[in-house]
Every structure is written in C-alpha cells, then in structure tokens.
C-alpha cells in the first residue's frame, strides 16, 4: 500500500483469538475512507499471532507489530502502533469489539467539519446482554448521554467520559500531546484527562457505531490499573492540577462523607491538596471526624456550606446519576456555577 491512508486504526491484541477475526473484519469492511489496520500483538499466548499473520498475508491494509519481551501492556502496544501510523486520523478499536458500518467515514467527516476538535467518539451498544451488570449499564447510559465537548469535559472527573475503542483523533495532535503513557491508572482515562487539561475538545456523535463486547477476560475486569483504587489516584491527581488555578485560595470542601468522599479527601492530600472538610445531609455523619494521612476533617451540614462567606469551592463525591442530578439542582439554587464554584467527581 503506497499511498498514505486517511485513517490508521490501532488494534492492540492479547489473547483475543476467539473474537479477533470478527473484530478485524468489521474494520476492513469500513467504506468511505481509505484505512490501514495496525495490529500490535502484546505477548499473546493463543493463536492470535498466527491469525494476524494470515490476515496480513491476505490484505495489504493490515500491518503488524509486536511488543518486545512479551506482554508490555496496552499503552506500550498503542505507542508502537502510533509510531507506525501514516493516516491523518488515528482510530481505536479493541480486538474483541465490532465497528458498525460507516463509523470511520462518519467520524472523519466530523473532524473535517470541526477543525477545532481533537477527537470524535460515538455512542456504544454493549453485548451480550447477559454479561452486562447494572453498574456497567448505568455507566454506558451516562457516557452515551454526553454529546458536546462541554459535557464531556465537565464530567471527566467522574470516570472516563468516552470508551477508548470509540475514539478517532487527529494523528499529529495526538503525537503532540504525547500519545499514551504507561501510568498507574487506565491509559484511556489518562489520555482523556490530559486532552481536557490541554483544552483539546472531544465531541460524541449521536450515532451508535461500536458494539462493545462484555466478557470475563476484559482488561477492565482484570487489570489493576482499572481498579477503584487506581481510578481514585487518577481522579485526585488531575483534580489537584485542575483546582490549582481556579480556586483562588478559597477553602475546599468535599460533598459526601461516604466511602467515595472519604477516599477522595485522603487521596487529595497525596497530591498536596488538603481540604477543609466534608459535607453531608446524614444527621448521623454530621459533626463526626474523618481521619487519614495525618489529617482530621470535620463533617458539616450542607446548610453550613451554603452560608459560608466568602464562597468556598466544592467537589461533589456523591456517587450515582440521581445523586449527581440532585447536587447540581441544589447548588444551582444557591447560584453556584459548575466549574467556577464546584466540580462533580462521582
């Protein structure tokens, strides 16, 4: 393949033989854009490597690479793929998912229409339904509801606001950002948080263009970097960087004295941020003391927070879609502005 393709599709592969053929076929069936499929084998121990070799022999659009010394992790595999990419745009797909018809063409057209965008994502349908747990269903519903760059940026501290295999990005902008890092937390959320921090907007198309396969072998279920503890470290790290220029010295309060709020207020201290305390509506918690990392924080009622002057800054750590809606409604009644006076992080 001599001419540079429009899109370079990066597919990291590790022990995905049961699904690899379907996933690759869904990429190669895309029309409306020229493409290359860059498959990086990350230490597979199944038949995946031989399947990839057969695929490359039968289709010149398939280019192969492999990580050195066995499994090195998805960030390393993606970095190798990015170094090989020749396309104007880089799209992501996992070796167990399915691209739906028209995805690449629709995302490329969106990037052409809006040159200010760093990337474009899309809505997702998960399958098979029997493997989809209630928490994951709620997570996907929340993600799919976020369409505009402002919504995606606003909610970024809750969890990753876009499934990684739905992304398409401008290749040079991705390289300028530093590509993927091998961090102590999920590489996809790390990339998204760095993009948001750099002011790089991402839009979600309202179309469902990826089928996300849910199964027990998924990295999200088995890799420690996707654990709750790792996510909290990432959240605290990027929140601390975000808060530094916008708090203007105002006291910081964490809304919610439950497990998430307690974990967050402790994690923030490791990033050099010591909050004033926690806020709750539960009479059993109000007046209590939370201790950790050499600090002690009191728990106050939300009415006490409302009456403070000058106005403090708050991080909401009350988990769940309904709880988020209640927090936003209540703080709007106080004339607090999201991002200026508070952020939502659960």
Named regions from a protein language model:
Residues 41-50, 71, 94:
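A conserved acidic beta->alpha catalytic loop
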Residues 90:
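Short aromatic/hydrophobic "clamp" motif used to bind/position activated sugar donors
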Residues 157, 211-346:
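Hydrophobic, well-ordered beta-alpha structural blocks that scaffold small-molecule cofactor pockets
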Residues 74, 83, 139, 144-223:
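Conserved nucleotide-sugar donor-binding catalytic segment
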Residues 1-26:
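N-proximal low-complexity "stem/linker" segments adjacent to membrane-targeting elements
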Residues 102-137:
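Conserved donor NDP-sugar-binding/catalytic core segment of glycosyltransferases
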């Amino acid at each position: 393949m001599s001419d540079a393709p429009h899109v370079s599709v990066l597919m990291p592969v590790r022990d995905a033989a049961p699904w690899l053929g379907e996933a690759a076929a869904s990429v190669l069936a895309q029309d409306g854009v020229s493409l290359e499929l860059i498959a990086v084998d990350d230490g597979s121990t199944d038949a995946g490597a031989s399947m990839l070799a057969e695929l490359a022999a039968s289709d010149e659009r398939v280019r192969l690479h492999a990580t050195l010394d066995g499994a090195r992790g998805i960030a390393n595999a993606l970095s190798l793929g990015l170094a090989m990419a020749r396309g104007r745009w880089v799209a992501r797909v996992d070796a167990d998912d399915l691209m739906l018809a028209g995805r690449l063409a629709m995302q490329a057209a969106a990037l052409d229409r809006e040159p200010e965008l760093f990337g474009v994502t899309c809505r997702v349908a998960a399958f098979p339904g029997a493997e989809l747990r209630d928490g994951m269903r709620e997570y996907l519903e929340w993600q799919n509801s976020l369409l505009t760059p402002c919504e995606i940026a606003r909610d970024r501290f809750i969890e990753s606001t876009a499934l990684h295999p739905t992304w398409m990005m401008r290749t040079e902008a991705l390289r300028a950002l530093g590509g993927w890092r091998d961090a102590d937390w999920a590489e996809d959320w790390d990339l998204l948080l760095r993009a948001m921090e750099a002011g790089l907007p991402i839009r979600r198309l309202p179309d469902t263009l990826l089928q996300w396969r849910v199964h027990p072998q998924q990295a999200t279920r088995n890799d420690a970097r996707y654990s709750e503890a790792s996510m909290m470290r990432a959240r605290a790290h990027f929140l601390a960087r975000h808060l530094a220029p916008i708090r203007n010295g105002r006291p910081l309060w964490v809304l919610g004295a439950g497990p998430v709020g307690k974990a967050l207020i402790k994690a923030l201290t490791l990033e050099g941020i010591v909050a004033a305390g926690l806020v709750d509506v539960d009479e059993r918690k109000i007046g209590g003391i939370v201790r950790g990392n050499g600090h002690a924080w009191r728990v106050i009622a939300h009415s006490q927070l409302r009456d403070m002057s000058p106005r403090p800054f708050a991080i909401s750590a009350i988990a769940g879609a309904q709880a988020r809606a209640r927090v936003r409604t209540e703080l709007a009644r106080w004339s607090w502005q999201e991002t200026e006076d508070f952020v939502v992080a659960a």
